[in-house]
């Protein structure tokens, strides 16, 4: 045998690999023990206690047993490519520990553990490192990762003897590959997926990411949520939601003056004067507050990130809990909600629908999701003459406002229009070089807020000149990840305004009192104020 046999196992009075079944079982059990111990570190101790399920030891035993098949499948995968039990154990433990470490890092950064839909964002994390604050994923990261994965694997392959039977080797290799890969493949087969998803749903119950991370550990929780996501009957969910909303197209919206609705989703916008920052000047925001028929603080779908969750809540009018496991990344299954979201309803009622977002069209799969949700036209980053080295990291709100006004001018006077604008200007990171000589992240954020306020004035003044009713909805998608100011924000609710402009303005208007609102109610509230919301939708 190799050097490992002669020296590495010299203290053992027998050769472990002469007992392949016992060694393999022992390595699997060792993996389970290490994984059970390390899974707890996916969340800080305080969060773990806070989200621990309130039930007894019997249920806890069931949760532990439920993790064993997941660990076994990962172990089988490493074993299938090597037929080396020690390597399979090391690979399995490393695999789970890496997932736990990623989950802990994500929670530290954005206060949410790893969720199954994050796997769909892996390519985006490496493609858009700045927007994910992942600039450290550079060449050094790849060298270290490569050396660890392939270097350690090579050492095991060289020093650890294989236990692959001498006879019928190809047969046993294929059998093991089938055992390792077969169950994963069967998850996509309806007759297997549906009962499996139902069983997992009974086990998991509520889709509570933090609680399920405590119960099952990071990777098992990700797998269980993915199985539920694959098997959930969205047609039934959508049918129930449609019945609740009574969203009949013929009862929808009509108006003789061809109104225009502009929804401006302002990236990371929150009025810092709520937190005692009196140095900032936001005259346009103050103006909107006085002119609004409704304004106040907007609850968070997610604090500090995941813009698409707030975005979908506003566009759909759906409470995140109502869309079950899709809530974490609704655009993955956008087609299922096409008939009940606002853009689709408006388009079918004869409105022109336009989505404007000065960022890569493939990000969050918007290039696929938005047409499915009812937007007939998309204006994305490739439509802007933007050079980061010349214009800054993101397209400014001033440039975006000018583009919105230009697109609005193209809308025929006799046609109603719905424009959803998602800005990018104040997305982090707030690093030196973004605003003059400023170096402090808070100062940079405040300066961009003031720039955004000036751009809003440009937009509002332009919209007020139109000869049609205009309804303007403005809101911040989430609080900024401004850790040097607060982590987390003491009150993460953002600001919103529903403002009538141009011919929609009343002759006499008195300022309104602030009203708290939820993102999924925002467009419904606007339509009621505009008298564009029929009884059938209430």
From Swiss-Prot:
Keyword tags: Capsule biogenesis/degradation, Cell membrane, Membrane, Transmembrane, Transmembrane helix
Domain of life: Bacteria
Biological process, per Gene Ontology: capsule polysaccharide biosynthetic process
Membrane topology of this protein: Multi-pass membrane protein
Major location (coarse): membrane
CDD domains per UniProt: LTA_synthase
One Pfam family here: Sulfatase
Pathway noted in the entry: Capsule biogenesis; capsule polysaccharide biosynthesis
Underlying gene: rkpI
Physiological role: Involved in antigen K (capsular polysaccharide) biosynthesis.
Subcellular location: Cell membrane
Entries under InterPro entries matching the protein: Alkaline_phosphatase_core_sf, OpgB/LTA_synthase_biosynth, Sulfatase_N
Organism: Rhizobium meliloti (strain 1021)
Cellular component terms (Gene Ontology): plasma membrane
Parts of the chain that traverse the membrane: 16-36, 70-90, 114-134, 139-159, 170-190, 212-232
Protein name: Capsular polysaccharide biosynthesis protein RkpI
């Amino acid at each position: 045998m190799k050097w490992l046999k002669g020296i590495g196992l010299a203290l053992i009075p027998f050769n472990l690999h002469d007992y392949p079944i016992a060694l393999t079982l022992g390595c699997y059990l060792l993996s389970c023990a290490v994984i059970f111990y390390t899974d707890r570190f996916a969340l800080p101790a305080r969060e773990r206690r806070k989200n621990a399920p309130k039930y007894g030891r019997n249920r806890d035993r069931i949760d532990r047993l439920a993790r064993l098949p997941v660990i076994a499948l990962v172990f089988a995968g490493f074993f299938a490519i090597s037929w080396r039990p020690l390597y399979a154990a090391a690979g399995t433990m490393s695999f789970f520990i890496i997932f736990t470490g990623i989950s802990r890092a994500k929670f530290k950064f954005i206060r949410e553990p790893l969720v199954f839909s994050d796997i769909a964002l892996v390519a985006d994390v490496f493609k858009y490192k700045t927007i994910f604050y992942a600039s450290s994923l550079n060449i050094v990261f790849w060298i270290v990762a490569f050396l660890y994965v392939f270097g350690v694997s090579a050492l095991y392959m060289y020093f650890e003897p294989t236990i692959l039977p001498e006879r019928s080797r190809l047969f046993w290799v294929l059998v093991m590959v089938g055992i390792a890969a077969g169950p994963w493949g069967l998850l996509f087969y309806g007759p297997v997926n549906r009962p499996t998803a139902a069983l997992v749903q009974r086990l998991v119950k509520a889709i509570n990411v933090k609680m399920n991370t405590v119960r099952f550990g990071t990777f098992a929780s990700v797998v269980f949520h993915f199985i539920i996501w694959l098997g959930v009957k969205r047609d039934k969910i959508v049918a129930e939601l449609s019945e609740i909303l009574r969203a009949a197209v013929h009862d929808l919206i009509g108006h003789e003056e061809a109104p225009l609705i502009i929804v401006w989703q302002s990236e990371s916008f929150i009025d810092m004067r709520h937190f005692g920052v009196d140095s900032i000047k936001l005259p346009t925001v103050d103006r909107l507050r006085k002119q609004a028929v409704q304004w106040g603080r907007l609850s968070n779908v997610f604090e500090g990130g995941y813009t698409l969750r707030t975005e979908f809540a506003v566009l759909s009018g759906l409470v995140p809990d109502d869309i079950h496991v899709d809530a974490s990344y609704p655009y993955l299954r956008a087609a299922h909600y096409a008939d009940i979201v606002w853009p689709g309803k408006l388009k079918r009622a004869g409105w022109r629908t336009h989505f404007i977002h000065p960022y890569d069209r493939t990000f969050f799969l918007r290039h696929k999701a938005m047409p499915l949700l009812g937007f007939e036209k998309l204006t994305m980053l490739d439509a802007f003459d933007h050079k980061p080295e010349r214009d800054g990291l993101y397209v400014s709100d001033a440039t975006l406002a000018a583009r919105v006004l230009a697109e609005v001018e193209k809308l025929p006077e006799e046609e109603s229009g719905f424009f959803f604008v998602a800005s990018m200007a104040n997305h982090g990171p707030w690093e030196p070089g973004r605003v003059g000589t400023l170096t402090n992240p808070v100062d940079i954020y405040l300066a961009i807020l003031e720039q955004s306020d000036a751009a809003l004035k440009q937009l509002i003044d332009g919209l007020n000149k139109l000869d049609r009713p205009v309804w303007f909805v403005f809101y911040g998608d989430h609080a900024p990840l401004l850790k040097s100011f607060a982590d987390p924000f003491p009150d993460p609710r953002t600001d919103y305004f529903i403002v009538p402009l141009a011919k929609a303005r009343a002759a006499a208007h008195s300022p309104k009192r602030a009203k708290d609102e939820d993102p999924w109610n925002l467009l419904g509230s606007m339509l009621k104020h505009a008298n564009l919301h029929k009884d059938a939708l209430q």
